[in-house]
């Protein structure tokens, strides 16, 4: 199904051609002055230079070809040469009906589907998720959903940090606290216990304690470094402990991510890439890419066009230990081997930009990826408190993610109970659904690359550009449709008729932009464009709702038309919020 703007552009292009001009000037855009017209074409302005002719004259020639237009009810030339356009209500209604019949609401499936791996989430095991983990998880999840909706094969990978010093610190602290455990007995030859010698809450206390000690006690730090080394060498007792740490930690991470409605296809870890490192490093040395610099092994990645210094990409430290760059490069090797992706996208803090410039350049220079494989980095900004500084607890500490979710849920519960629109037994569940919309929409409505203020009062409001406002609109539509069914109406009967007033036509025009918006949101990896769109659709619907008697309309065909339009609006809004990663309750 052709997008509405494509159909308009085709007609404009044909008019340019008939008038003797290049059809490529027939591009149509949404009007930047909706008080004057619905759409506009600026092609005559662009063509004036090529044809040595006043733009007003070119526009006049083109408009003359639109006198019997199937699409436009008005085509008017405005000096110095703009073409202002209004669309026929019949054409818009016809498009609405086709859109309603289309399973994907007029979004075309990608003609050349790609395999795309999105690396997002990225927590370290044995540490609780905190608010700093929020953005990667929900931005990555949304981009994954949008990519799948437009027809690509998108694989989400959490890429756990499980192989660094934190493991050595936990093992060392456990050894100090419980030296009698069999994991520390070098003479032990039996099977290690199936049950972990700690709970998740104990594990989350052990790590910060060990980390604090290592900063003050050099001998303790050296012991932890040695434990890390022995683990990486495959010491049986330490490997068994590592498995326990992983199992306990991943179970808790899955629970926390489920509360955010974030779901990963792969739970790959840094350790999964370790087997690829020796051959990868050896190959880079053999082919002359890697060389020693002050004892470390590095690859030059600077380019002549650089405007700032890009240091060499370090593969191995002087003691032979690998780094994040090594692991990330080996992970690329693993991903190319297992999935042959067309693109790998990393959704991480923008402060890691230099790291990824080095990794991507090294991967390209050394041939770890195919020349056509796209490596991309979406660096997001910081989530700040009202003071403009990184979001903290009232005491100034880093807030755990589950505490933030609980605080938002509590605030939504209070507002819902005040509203008394939901039975008390359902209020808690409804508060969770609406609370998640407040968090996700509050974040995703901002351009990912920018910092933003996390304002609990604003994000949980039922008014303005918020998640709860969008859900309130969906619930309002559901309520009208349910009432019609309860009165004996059949929602499968009827079709959308030409708009009877300006607010209805505006709603239809907003809905007609769905396909172009989704495709653009994926192309630019920009979930904020979905938020901006559904806010406009919600406003358009609420204006229509306040100006139109829907259920009391006496003309049955007209009433059925309104209800078909409501069903389409609900589908567009529900599909959009699903792409953002949340859903709507039945009542609020």
Range-by-range predicted roles:
Residues 94-99:
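Short, charged, solvent-exposed linker or helix-capping segments at domain edges/interfaces
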Residues 100-110:
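Flexible, low-complexity linker/hinge segments
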